[in-house]
A protein has these predicted regions:
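Catalytic-domain carbohydrate-binding cleft regions of carbohydrate-active enzymes
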Residues: 20-318
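Sec-dependent N-terminal signal peptides
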Residues: 3-15, 19
Length: 318
């Protein structure tokens, strides 16, 4: 009889552990100047959304892309316009050119958001911007203040599938308060302290595919609502990243970041993370010498634009 009780308790324990619900944030990232195959991509996205009503995506597409989409594939554009404000879609990075924010000035970052938001809202007037999330490490320590000024409520510091460009330090649990240098805080999903780099890899963390090992580490770390993510390159002809229906990996539920933070996560935290530039472990991929030079030239150019604007204002006032 004792053996039976032990067996039943063991089964109950493991059933309880593995019944913990996993979540996954899917989406696309790219743009007209990088990888967005205009001739077929938008039609493919709307078809996939219609085919998989339980699928959710976050969009990180360079805003100017929609100018070309509207001209070259107008029917697909109009269909996506109808879906853009549905619960299946969230726009998470409206910056004009998806900059690696750590190498440009705060004024340049503000312009990236200002121009990008205006362009997206020109195409999709009903879209709002609540969560900042990116596929590549487009982070800098001053973002909380800038995000709050543009009406964002939440941020995400994960970039599990593009760590060759860099990644944030692993810290905390389900949620943290990301505190900027000026003291502004924004509720954030971090790269968990238990979210490791994949074995033998410097370009992925374990959160990229909701693997058994990742979910187990989350459970052991006390994370009640584990979530992974991958914003697929827009050039890939692939729908739901983890599969669909009964074939979805580890029974993960697709969700947008806004829905996850507001309706699934613990919702708040007392864990204040004073995030600095040193917590962004970055690298210039695809040839560091060439890209280092490009980054320097970008910074010089953007600084000159700001200087020219200031001189123009001073001349006008005189």
């Amino acid at each position: 009889m004792n053996k039976i009780y032990i067996i039943l308790l063991t089964v109950f324990f493991y059933a309880n552990v593995y019944s913990q619900q996993a979540y996954f944030v899917d989406g696309y990232h790219g743009g007209i100047y990088g990888h967005y195959p205009v001739k077929w991509k938008t039609q493919f996205v709307v078809d996939q959304l219609a085919m998989h009503p339980d699928w959710r995506i976050c969009m990180e597409i360079e805003p100017e892309t929609w100018d070309t989409v509207r001209v070259q594939t107008p029917e697909a554009y109009l269909r996506f316009k109808e879906m853009a404000t549905s619960n299946q879609v969230e726009f998470t990075n409206p910056t004009y050119a998806q900059p690696y924010c750590y190498n440009i000035s705060g004024e340049s970052i503000i312009r990236q958001f200002q121009y990008g938001i205006a362009k997206i809202n020109k195409h999709f007037p009903g879209v709002d911007f609540v969560t900042y999330s990116v596929e590549e490490p487009c982070f800098t320590s001053c973002l909380p203040q800038i995000l709050k000024q543009f009406g964002f409520k939440y941020a995400v510091l994960k970039c599990p599938n593009t760590c060759w460009g860099g990644y944030t330090a692993a810290y905390g649990g389900e949620l943290v308060n990301w505190v900027g240098p000026d003291g502004t805080a924004i509720l954030t999903v971090p790269r968990y302290a238990c979210e490791k780099l994949e074995p033998g890899s410097t370009w992925q963390t374990t959160a990229w595919g909701n693997s058994d090992a990742y979910l187990k580490d989350c459970r052991n770390a006390g994370i009640k609502h584990p979530v992974g993510m991958c914003f697929q390159d827009a050039g890939w002809k692939n729908g739901p990243w983890l599969g669909s229906g009964k074939n979805t990996k580890n029974n993960s539920i697709y969700i947008t970041w806004r829905d996850y933070i507001e309706n699934v996560s613990i919702g708040k935290t007392d864990d204040n993370w004073y995030f600095s530039q040193e917590d962004i472990h970055v690298n210039l991929m695809w040839g560091s010498q060439v890209l280092q030079k490009i980054a320097q030239e970008v910074r010089v150019s953007e600084n000159r634009i700001v200087m020219a604007e200031k001189m123009s204002v001073m001349a006008y006032l005189e």
